[in-house]
């Protein structure tokens, strides 16, 4: 039985002291469970990799298509690659820390596995309590494309 993926708006409240940028991004809900919470990205002041185009049109226009491609058409069949799902809300740089996932696919489905916290200079910290998940390709593609719709 395939897992169900749904995007949900994720809001980070901004402030002036300390300076924090307000962000509207997306959480990834799998079978009704927030990956933002399950991966503890919420404890590290991260945001989703997709900007919500209803609130962050310019950022969504600049980055969402590329991110959607990394999660869909650019995924090598059988081998896969790693993609950041939750990133620094200020710069999205891996060096600030990110929650990543191995994305792989076959002709009928896409798999998310090997969730980890990475920063590019320390050994990754595996998040063994999260995943793996398998999504039916057509439904998955429809939901990911929703993030890049303007």
Language model features: what each stretch is:
Residues 1-150:
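Intrinsically disordered, low-complexity acidic regions enriched in Pro/Ser/Thr
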């Amino acid at each position: 039985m395939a897992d169900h993926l749904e995007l949900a708006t994720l809001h980070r409240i901004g402030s002036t002291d300390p300076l924090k940028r307000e962000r509207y991004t997306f959480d990834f809900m799998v079978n009704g469970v927030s990956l933002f919470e399950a991966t503890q990205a919420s404890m590290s002041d991260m945001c989703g990799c997709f900007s919500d185009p209803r609130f962050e049109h310019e950022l969504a226009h600049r980055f969402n298509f590329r991110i959607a491609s990394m999660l869909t058409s650019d995924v090598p069949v059988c081998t896969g690659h790693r993609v950041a799902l939750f990133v620094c809300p200020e710069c999205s740089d891996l060096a600030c820390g990110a929650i990543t996932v191995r994305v792989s696919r076959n002709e009928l489905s896409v798999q998310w596995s090997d969730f980890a916290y990475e920063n590019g200079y320390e050994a990754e910290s595996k998040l063994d309590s999260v995943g793996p998940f398998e999504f039916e390709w057509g439904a998955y593609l429809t939901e990911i494309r929703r993030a890049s719709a303007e």
